Structure formats: C-alpha cells, structure tokens
C-alpha cells in the first residue's frame, strides 16, 4: 500500500464532524460515512484500503511507509436515536445551536475522528507513518469490525507501533482523563432444566428454581478479588432471572438467568467461565435435571503500563487543555481490547456525558480543542519515537 505524497490542506474539524453526523450510520449501517471519511484522507495523501467482513465496512488508511506507525482507531457506526421527536435538533441534521453541535455521534465518536483528521492535516510532513483504523461495527455485535481488521493486519505483518482510540474518555472536562486499560467482560447465560408439574405434587416434578437460586447465591458469595494495581475490584452482576411462569400452582420446567462479570487482570476470562460452569455442575448434583452455562468472553482485561507513550499523551493533553489527565482504567469495554494484540493502546477523547442519549451534543470549541490536543500529540509522538 503506497501512500501518495502528503498534501497540505486545512480542515475544519467541526465541518467534518457535521458531514459525518449527517450520515445516519446506525449500526450496522454505513450510510456513506466511510466514503465521506475516505475522501478526506485521500486528499491528505493517505492510501486507503476498505476491509469488508460480512456486511461491515472497515477502513485502514496509512500515510507513510516507515516506522514508527502511529494509528488512530475509532468507529463511524452509532447507536439508535430513540424518539426523534424528543431531540432539540434532528439527530442527523448536525445543527449548531448557541455554539453546541447536536447529533447522534457528536460525542461517540464522529467528532473525535474529525478532530484527528484535522490534526493530521496540520502536520503534513512527519517521519514514520500515521494510520487510521476505522470500523462500522463497534456499537453492535463487534464481530466483523476491529477484531477482524486486527487479525488481518497481523497476518499480513502490518506493524502498528502505538495506537490512540478516540473514545469519549473525559469525565467532566476535556482532558481530565485518559484510559490506559480496561476491565475484561464475560457474559454467562445460565439455564436449569427440570420437569414441570403441579405444586401440590412436587415429587412428580423437578423444580429448577431452587437450583438456579443456589447457583446465583454461590456466584454472588465469592469475593473475586480486592482490586488490582490500577484497577477497581472485579464485579459480578445478575442481570436477568426468568422462569416464564405466570401461574401460581405450576412448578416451571426451566429457569434461566444471565450474569456479567467485569474483571481486572487478576483473572482470565476462561478461568471465570470454568468457575461458572463448575458452580452449575455442583448445584445440579442429585437434581433430576440439568444446569448449564453458555459463557461468552467479550474481552480480556488489559493495561498499557505508564511510560514514554503515556508521557507523550499526558504532555500533549496538558499543553492543549491546561490540565493533566488522570490515567484511568474505569468504564466499559471498547475496541481497544482488540487493538492491544497489536501494540500499546491509549484512549483519549471528548467528555462522554451525553453519549447514547437523546440530544447527544458537544460544544464546537471542544471539538477544536480536541483537534489541537491531537496535533500536539502527533508532534510530540514523532519527536519522542522517530
């Protein structure tokens, strides 16, 4: 993939954010969002490559062929808007009211993509390479997006030295927090199958409910850990319990529950899955039925250790915002969990307080300030690593 010569072009991050928001790319739809982005990147001298898996559009773009390769990762897909009528401005109109940009994706995370593109436009000459890894499958099942692109790039021998993910990591003020790691996540669907019968004749039935209660009690009784350096304690939550029984005189045939564990690096997903399966087997001993657990690991816990890379980011954010960010591992999962397989990864973006909400919005000056922070990051990065 040969990059055209870098071109000096000025890009307004707010205008590009508006152009992206006007593409109604509700996951898994693309709605032309990738085309909009690709045109801008090609104008800046990037060699762009579409990587489609299933029905999902992904884009890998690179300017330069040498190392180090600094990558920006993000997603153009967005969550559904909910009730259109509840919005102050149309969710895909990208309207600016009193200095605030409204629209689905304004925070999560089309404005961050636009800000990094604008930053790159202001640094036309740099050593090494700059790349973009953009997916249309982050808000959905996340099976044909970043994870597949990472696997393909690794198989081809593509080297990414460091990555910035533009998720909205700031808590209250732009630049007050960056994420250097994330907890892992595992979901378990637990099913206990018994035998339906009349409550007056329990000997003719096999009640799955007490078995499910025993399983859930055992899972909740265990203290998974007391925390891990840089991480809060791992946590298990019961998210659903269902027997599908509306009668008061019927023992149900089956009982189901779902649990989620957010875990720190003290655990591996496979070990937690084995533990859940073991508790199911233990509770079902002597029961005239079966208890099973279907476990799915969404991602393992990871940490990018503080060092030269995080120092560059902290300095750049401080330069642009006047505040030194907290290095955090809080929050949910992101595509950083896949990128960690390629290189050290850190997340930094806008304040996330309105993401996924009606009236998702961001002050336009914060979009421009984020572009300035990204530009400072790019310059500091190549000064440190090239």
Curated annotation (Swiss-Prot):
The active site is at residues 77, 138. GO terms for molecular function: acetylornithine deacetylase activity; cobalt ion binding; succinyl-diaminopimelate desuccinylase activity; zinc ion binding. It catalyses: N-succinyl-(2S,6S)-2,6-diaminopimelate + H2O = (2S,6S)-2,6-diaminopimelate + succinate. Coiled coil: none annotated. Zn(2+) 2 binds at residues 108, 139, 356. Its cofactor is Zn(2+); Co(2+). Binds 2 Zn(2+) or Co(2+) ions per subunit. GO terms for biological process: diaminopimelate biosynthetic process; L-arginine biosynthetic process; lysine biosynthetic process via diaminopimelate. It holds the Pfam family Peptidase_M20. The keyword Translocase does not apply. HAMAP family: DapE. This is Succinyl-diaminopimelate desuccinylase. It comes from Caulobacter vibrioides (strain NA1000 / CB15N) (Caulobacter crescentus). The gene is dapE.
């Amino acid at each position: 993939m040969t990059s055209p010569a870098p071109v000096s072009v000025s890009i307004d991050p707010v205008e590009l954010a508006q152009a992206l928001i006007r593409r109604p790319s509700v996951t898994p739809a693309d709605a032309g969002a990738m085309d909009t982005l690709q045109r801008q990147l090609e104008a800046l001298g990037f060699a762009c490559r579409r990587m489609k898996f299933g029905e999902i559009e992904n884009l890998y773009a690179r300017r330069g062929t040498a190392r180090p390769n600094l990558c920006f990762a993000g997603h153009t897909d967005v969550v559904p808007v909910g009730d259109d009528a509840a919005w102050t401005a149309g969710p895909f109109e990208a309207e600016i009211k009193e200095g605030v940009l409204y629209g689905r994706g304004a925070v999560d995370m089309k404005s961050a993509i636009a800000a990094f593109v604008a930053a790159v436009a202001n640094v036309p000459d740099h050593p090494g390479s700059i790349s973009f890894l953009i997916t249309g499958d982050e808000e959905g099942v996340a099976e044909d997006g970043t994870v597949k692109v990472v696997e393909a790039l690794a198989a081809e021998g593509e080297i990414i030295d460091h990555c910035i993910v533009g998720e909205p990591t700031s808590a209250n003020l732009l630049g007050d927090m960056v994420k250097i790691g994330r907890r892992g996540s595992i979901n378990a669907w637990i099913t206990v199958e018994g035998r339906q019968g009349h409550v007056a004749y329990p000997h003719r039935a096999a009640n799955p409910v007490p078995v499910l209660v025993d399983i859930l009690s055992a899972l909740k009784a265990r203290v998974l850990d007391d925390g891990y350096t840089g991480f809060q304690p791992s946590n298990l939550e019961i998210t659903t319990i269902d027997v599908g029984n509306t009668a008061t005189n019927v023992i149900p045939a089956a009982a189901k529950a779902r649990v989620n564990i957010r875990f720190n690096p003290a655990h591996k997903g496979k070990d937690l899955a084995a533990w859940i399966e073991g508790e199911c087997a233990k509770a079902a001993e002597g029961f005239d039925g079966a208890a099973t657990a279907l476990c799915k690991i969404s991602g393992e816990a990871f940490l990018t250790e503080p060092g030269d890379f995080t120092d560059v980011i902290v300095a750049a954010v401080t330069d642009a915002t006047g505040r030194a960010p907290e290095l955090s591992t809080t929050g949910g999962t992101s595509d950083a969990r896949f990128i960690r397989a390629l290189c050290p990864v850190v997340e930094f973006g806008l304040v996330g307080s309105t993401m996924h909400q009606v009236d998702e919005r961001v002050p336009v000056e914060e979009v421009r300030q984020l572009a300035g922070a990204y530009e400072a990051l790019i310059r500091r990065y190549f000064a440190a690593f090239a």
